[in-house]
């Protein structure tokens, strides 16, 4: 009798243990499936973003726009997608929509230097020079060698006729990325405006050679 009770108790223990093991396995499987699904979704979105970027580069902005909108619908916390969507809006001169998308990107990642640079550049295009300066400087705060932010800040100061500041940031942009042809052009224009014709000629010559080489 005593042995039967022990056997019965062992059976219950084994059954409970088995249930716990099965529950644990199911939990692990759910985690793996969820993780794999999430990774698969992210991979698909990355491929779609790459494809949309190629479409935009080819001038097919409306097609690119549809893809980026779909990605942001599927993955609303994808700050890269919101940034890329804003870039297409900007290229199609839908500036208010572009601003909103950049702001969304930055609400998700406030230190994302690309969006900070891009929204700063857009504000410069729209003539909002104070806001442009604020965002471009923030971009450089988080990514000190970001050549595009330095060049855009240099161009902003050029537009404001603050030539010394413009020269400082344009030269910095070239240190960080020596192949920035536009920086040479702007430096040449500053030299020309300040009467340094020979220096201007040299910069324009470098700019011209770079443009021809890139064709």
Q: Can you name each region flagged by the protein language model?
A:
Residues 4, 8-19, 26:
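Short, low-complexity, charge-dense intrinsically disordered segments
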Residues 57-70, 91-104, 114, 125-138, ...:
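Structural signature of tandem alpha-helical TPR/SEL1-like repeats
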Residues 24-33:
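Bacterial N-terminal signal peptides
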Residues 44-80, 87, 91:
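Alpha-helical segment of the N-proximal tetratricopeptide repeat
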Residues 44-46, 79-80, 113-114, 147-148, ...:
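Helix-start (N-cap) detector for alpha-helical repeat units in TPR-like alpha-solenoids
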């Amino acid at each position: 009798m005593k042995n039967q009770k022990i056997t019965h108790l062992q059976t219950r223990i084994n059954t409970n243990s088995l249930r716990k093991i099965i529950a644990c396995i199911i939990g692990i499987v759910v985690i793996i499936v969820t993780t794999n699904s999430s990774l698969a979704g992210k991979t698909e979105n990355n491929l779609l973003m790459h494809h949309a970027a190629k479409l935009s580069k080819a001038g097919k902005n409306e097609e690119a726009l549809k893809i980026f909108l779909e990605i942001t619908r599927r993955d609303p916390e994808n700050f890269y997608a919101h940034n890329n969507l804003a870039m297409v809006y900007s290229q199609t001169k839908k500036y208010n929509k572009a601003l909103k998308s950049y702001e969304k990107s930055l609400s998700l990642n406030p230190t994302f230097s690309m969006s900070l640079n891009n929204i700063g550049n857009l504000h410069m295009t729209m003539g909002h020079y104070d806001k442009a300066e604020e965002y471009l400087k923030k971009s450089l705060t988080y990514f000190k060698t970001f050549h595009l932010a330095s060049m855009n800040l240099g161009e902003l100061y050029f537009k404001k006729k603050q030539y010394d500041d413009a020269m400082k940031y344009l030269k910095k942009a070239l240190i960080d990325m020596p192949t920035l042809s536009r920086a040479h052009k702007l430096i040449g224009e500053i030299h020309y405006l300040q009467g340094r014709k020979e220096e201007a000629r040299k910069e324009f010559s470098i700019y011209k050679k770079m443009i021809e080489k890139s064709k």
